[in-house]
């Protein structure tokens, strides 16, 4: 009787033991996955607190498993959708996350790793020293200014050699070629392509976009760029980089065999057609794509006949749409809608779009997520965005960043130095660093960055061949003189401004806010960027002198106000004195006032009256009489016709000459002999000095410059200036022979 009961009891005990053991193993394995152990809990299994702890751990583990399952199901559904590649919904409904750019090597990434965060350690980059190609369409003065900020942001982060390809009009070509030539950034190549030669390719397309015909030029890149160029990153000028562009270049490796274009999804509802009533956009896949940042696989595009394909697409859609609203972007999107397999969707942080109606804030959650910022609104920095202040500060960082600091070498990457860089290096090596005047000599050969036509310039010289440009230079502390000069001189002006990057932006804001300056399109502003410890006054003057388009120039200083009507008077004098066929320098007599507020004389008679009353003085009569004494002011008071004067030592008048006159000698920097040496060379070239009887200019008071303070306080400064004078005399004698000996004699007799 007891045997059957004893057997059942044994079975029950074994079963209970098995259940307990199974439960124990389950908990042990489950918690070991998270790096935890339940050995301690097992020892305290009798404790109520331990049991509560185990229950909480189990509940937490269940929630984690459920969340992992949910993420796996989400990834599975997305991968199935990608594999199917439906015609539209695949692009319109995707989340703006990094998974949009997942390659085969990323299959093992978890959902959290593939969320909208940039994983720096996992980001692919280009090969070390691989040459990266960047293309940009740039036309006009404003775009040329914008592209500099783009280039700065790229150079700041880059670790690879770069080759920039610019599609430019004549204006941008002149500005950017001068800028890059004077910038001398190592491991950077620049090529220019004439946009005028490409206009016929796209001029037949009606376009309502504010960029005009240049907004369609990106369609022609397969034709414009060299045939041996296989890949290129194409950027708008209103782009700012916040990371190394090599990371973007590396995405080319993720392209499938069929993909030819890499784009970021448009972050507004424009292509959904619901922004306003009766809004009819061009066809696009879902939200469409933004063409501010493009990866173009040129080799594949040429092979598939891209030029013919985009033309057919444009012709077909224009039959119903009549014109483009977003320039090339409309045509790119219409093409992609018909050929979705050709596009590789980039993560949205490669083109965070700050335009009206944008939803770009869904694209990032942290600063580290930002890689490229796109100011694709006509409002630019004034666009509405809840984080716009942060983006604006990032943009301003590069806007005002000292471009000289970007001349750093790429260590480990061999590069061929430019001819300018080689010449500069050789000249530096020839200098003696122990020379007391080493800094002065080094300043003479230093190559400063130059940005020509910083603001819009539109002027065509008069047809009579007598047109004349006022030429001057200034720094930030003379900026207040510009409006007054523009009121006194209605003709063209060429101004060279010696400024830092940050000061150039202050000047830009000042000029754009001034009613006087912003309405003058015949004033050329040329920025010479600061570098070194001296003011390279003659180098800055030469920049202004070289960039005039009239046959004659009036060489003056910015703290002088010309008499009213001087522009017309000088043009008449040019004809009267036959300057086209003779070598003459017309002298404009200089006066000065010590009053900041002056009732400016409207005639010679008024000026003579003020001179007699002591309101005006002949210029520097009490400080540097020799500078203008040869003008012969006593004779000028009664003169009614032009009269000739002879050169004398230290004579430095302000003159009108032909544009092909000798340039200023750039060895003279800061204060002293910068104009004297120029007049001396004019005399050596046998220019006649002719004083005009009814012309005058008045010097306005200002605080002493920093350089004149150094001249007065530093014996070393004065010694070096004397040394430079002697060397100039020697060079003048070698250049002009025995006729130049009179200058050395005159100097010794002083």
Curated annotation (Swiss-Prot):
Q: Where does Mn(2+) 1 bind?
A: 236, 238
Per the record, the GO terms for biological process are:
protein glycosylation; protein O-linked mannosylation
Query: Region annotation Xylosyltransferase activity: residue ranges?
Result: 132-407
What does this protein's record comment on cofactor binding? Answer: Binds 2 Mn(2+) ions per subunit. The xylosyltransferase part binds one Mn(2+) and the beta-1,3-glucuronyltransferase part binds one Mn(2+).
Q: Which ranges sit in the Lumenal compartment?
A: 32-750
Q: Which UniProt keywords apply?
A: Glycoprotein, Glycosyltransferase, Golgi apparatus, Manganese, Membrane, Metal-binding, Multifunctional enzyme, Signal-anchor, Transferase, Transmembrane, Transmembrane helix
ATP-binding as a keyword of this entry, yes or no, is no
Keyword Glycosyltransferase assigned: yes
Chain segments annotated as transmembrane: 11-31
Spans annotated as Glucuronyltransferase activity: 408-750
- What EC number(s) has UniProt assigned to this enzyme? 2.4.-.-, 2.4.2.-, 2.4.1.-
The domain of life for this entry's organism is: Eukaryota
Q: Name one GO molecular function term.
A: xylosyltransferase activity
Cofactor(s) the protein needs: Mn(2+)
Q: One GO CC annotation, please?
A: Golgi membrane
Q: In which pathway does it act?
A: Protein modification; protein glycosylation
Q: Reaction(s) catalyzed by this protein?
A: 3-O-[beta-D-GlcA-(1->3)-beta-D-Xyl-(1->4)-Rib-ol-P-Rib-ol-P-3-beta-D-GalNAc-(1->3)-beta-D-GlcNAc-(1->4)-(O-6-P-alpha-D-Man)]-Thr-[protein] + UDP-alpha-D-xylose = 3-O-[alpha-D-Xyl-(1->3)-beta-D-GlcA-(1->4)-beta-D-Xyl-(1->4)-Rib-ol-P-Rib-ol-P-3-beta-D-GalNAc-(1->3)-beta-D-GlcNAc-(1->4)-(O-6-P-alpha-D-Man)]-Thr-[protein] + UDP + H(+); 3-O-{(1->[3)-alpha-D-Xyl-(1->3)-beta-D-GlcA-(1->](n)-4)-beta-D-Xyl-(1->4)-Rib-ol-P-Rib-ol-P-3-beta-D-GalNAc-(1->3)-beta-D-GlcNAc-(1->4)-O-6-P-alpha-D-Man}-L-Thr-[protein] + UDP-alpha-D-glucuronate = 3-O-{beta-D-GlcA-(1->[3)-alpha-D-Xyl-(1->3)-beta-D-GlcA-(1->](n)-4)-beta-D-Xyl-(1->4)-Rib-ol-P-Rib-ol-P-3-beta-D-GalNAc-(1->3)-beta-D-GlcNAc-(1->4)-O-6-P-alpha-D-Man}-L-Thr-[protein] + UDP + H(+); 3-O-{beta-D-GlcA-(1->[3)-alpha-D-Xyl-(1->3)-beta-D-GlcA-(1->](n)-4)-beta-D-Xyl-(1->4)-Rib-ol-P-Rib-ol-P-3-beta-D-GalNAc-(1->3)-beta-D-GlcNAc-(1->4)-O-6-P-alpha-D-Man}-L-Thr-[protein] + UDP-alpha-D-xylose = 3-O-{(1->[3)-alpha-D-Xyl-(1->3)-beta-D-GlcA-(1->](n+1)-4)-beta-D-Xyl-(1->4)-Rib-ol-P-Rib-ol-P-3-beta-D-GalNAc-(1->3)-beta-D-GlcNAc-(1->4)-O-6-P-alpha-D-Man}-L-Thr-[protein] + UDP + H(+)
- Entry-listed glycosylation sites: 116, 142, 228, 266
Q: Give the InterPro entries listed for this entry.
A: Glyco_trans_8, Nucleotide-diphossugar_trans, Xyl/GlcA_transferase
Topology of the protein relative to the lipid bilayer: Single-pass type II membrane protein
- Cell location: Golgi apparatus membrane
- Which PANTHER family does the UniProt record give? GLYCOSYLTRANSFERASE-RELATED, XYLOSYL- AND GLUCURONYLTRANSFERASE LARGE2
Q: What biological function has been recorded for the protein in this entry?
A: Bifunctional glycosyltransferase with both alpha-1,3-xylosyltransferase and beta-1,3-glucuronyltransferase activities involved in the maturation of alpha-dystroglycan (DAG1) by glycosylation leading to DAG1 binding to laminin G-like domain-containing extracellular proteins with high affinity and in a phosphorylated-O-mannosyl trisaccharide dependent manner. Elongates the glucuronyl-beta-1,4-xylose-beta disaccharide primer structure by adding repeating units [-3-Xylose-alpha-1,3-GlcA-beta-1-] to produce a heteropolysaccharide. Supports the maturation of DAG1 more effectively than LARGE1.
The family note in this entry says: In the C-terminal section; belongs to the glycosyltransferase 49 family.
Q: Give the protein name, as stated in the record.
A: Xylosyl- and glucuronyltransferase LARGE2s
Record the organism.
Danio rerio (Zebrafish)
Name of the gene this protein is made from = large2
């Amino acid at each position: 009787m007891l045997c059957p009961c004893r057997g059942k009891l044994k079975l029950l005990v074994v079963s209970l033991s098995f259940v307990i053991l199974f439960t124990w193993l389950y908990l042990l394995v489950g918690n070991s996955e998270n790096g935890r152990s339940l050995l301690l809990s097992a020892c305290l299994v009798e404790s109520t607190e331990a049991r509560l702890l185990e229950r909480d751990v189990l509940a937490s583990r269940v929630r984690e498993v459920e969340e992992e399952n949910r993420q796996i199901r989400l990834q599975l559904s997305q991968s199935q959708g990608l594999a199917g590649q439906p015609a539209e919904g695949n692009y319109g409904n995707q989340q703006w996350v990094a998974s949009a750019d997942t390659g085969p090597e990323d299959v093992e990434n978890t959902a959290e790793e593939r969320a909208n965060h940039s994983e720096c350690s996992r980001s692919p980059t280009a090969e070390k020293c691989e040459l990266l190609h960047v293309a940009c369409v740039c036309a006009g003065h404003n775009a040329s200014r914008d592209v500099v900020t783009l280039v700065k942001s790229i150079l700041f982060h880059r670790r690879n050699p770069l080759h920039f390809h610019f599609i430019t009009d004549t204006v941008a070509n002149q500005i950017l070629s001068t800028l890059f030539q004077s910038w001398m950034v190592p491991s950077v190549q620049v090529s220019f392509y004439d946009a005028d030669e490409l206009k016929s390719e796209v001029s037949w397309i009606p376009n309502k976009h504010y960029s005009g015909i240049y907004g369609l030029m990106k369609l022609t890149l397969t034709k414009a760029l060299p045939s041996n160029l296989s890949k290129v990153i194409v950027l708008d000028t209103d782009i700012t980089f916040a990371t190394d562009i090599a990371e973007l270049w590396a995405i080319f490796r993720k392209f499938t065999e069929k993909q030819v274009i890499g784009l970021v999804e448009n972050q507004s509802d424009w292509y959904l057609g619901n922004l306003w009533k009766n809004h009819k956009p061009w066809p696009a896949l879902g939200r469409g794509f933004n063409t501010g940042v493009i990866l173009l696989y040129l080799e594949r595009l040429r092979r598939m006949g891209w030029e013919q394909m985009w033309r057919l697409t444009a012709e077909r859609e224009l039959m119903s749409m009549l014109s483009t609203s977003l320039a090339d972007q409309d045509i790119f999107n219409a093409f992609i809608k018909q050929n979705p397999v050709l596009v590789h969707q980039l993560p949205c942080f490669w083109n965070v779009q700050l335009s009206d109606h944008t939803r770009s804030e869904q694209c990032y959650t942290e600063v580290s997520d930002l890689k490229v910022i796109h100011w694709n609104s006509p409002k630019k920095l004034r666009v509405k965005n809840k984080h716009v202040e942060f983006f604006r500060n990032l943009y301003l960082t590069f806007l005002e960043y000292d471009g000289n600091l970007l001349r750093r070498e790429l260590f480990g990457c061999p590069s061929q130095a430019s001819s300018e860089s080689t010449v500069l290096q050789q000249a530096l090596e020839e200098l003696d660093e122990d020379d007391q005047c080493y800094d002065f000599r080094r300043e003479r050969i230093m190559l400063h960055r130059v940005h020509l036509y910083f603001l819009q310039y539109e002027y065509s010289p008069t047809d009579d061949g007598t047109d004349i440009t006022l030429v001057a230079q200034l720094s930030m502390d003379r900026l207040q003189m510009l409006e007054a000069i523009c009121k006194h001189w209605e003709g063209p002006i060429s101004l060279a401004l010696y400024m830092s990057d940050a000061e150039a932006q202050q000047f830009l804001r000042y000029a754009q806010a001034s009613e006087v300056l912003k309405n003058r399109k015949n004033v050329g502003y040329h920025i010479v960027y600061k570098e070194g410890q001296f003011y390279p006054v003659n180098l800055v003057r030469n920049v202004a002198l070289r960039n005039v388009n009239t046959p004659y120039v009036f060489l003056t200083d910015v703290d002088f106000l010309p008499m009213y009507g001087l522009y017309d008077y000088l043009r008449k004098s040019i004809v009267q004195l036959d300057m086209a066929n003779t070598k003459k320098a017309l002298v404009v007599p200089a006066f000065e006032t010590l009053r900041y507020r002056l009732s400016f004389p409207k005639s010679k008679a008024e000026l003579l009256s003020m001179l007699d009353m002591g309101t005006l003085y002949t210029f520097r009569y009490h400080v540097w009489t020799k500078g203008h004494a040869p003008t012969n002011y006593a004779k000028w008071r009664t003169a009614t016709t032009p009269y000739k004067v002879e050169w004398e030592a230290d004579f430095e008048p302000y003159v009108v000459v032909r544009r092909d006159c000798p340039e200023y000698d750039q060895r003279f920097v800061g204060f002293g002999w910068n104009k004297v040496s120029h007049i001396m060379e004019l005399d050596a070239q046998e220019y006649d000095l002719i004083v005009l009887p009814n012309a005058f200019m008045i010097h306005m008071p200002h605080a002493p410059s920093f350089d004149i303070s150094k001249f007065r306080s530093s014996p070393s400064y004065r010694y070096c200036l004397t040394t430079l004078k002697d060397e100039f005399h020697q060079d003048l004698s070698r250049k002009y022979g025995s006729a130049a000996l009179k200058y050395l004699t005159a100097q010794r007799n002083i």
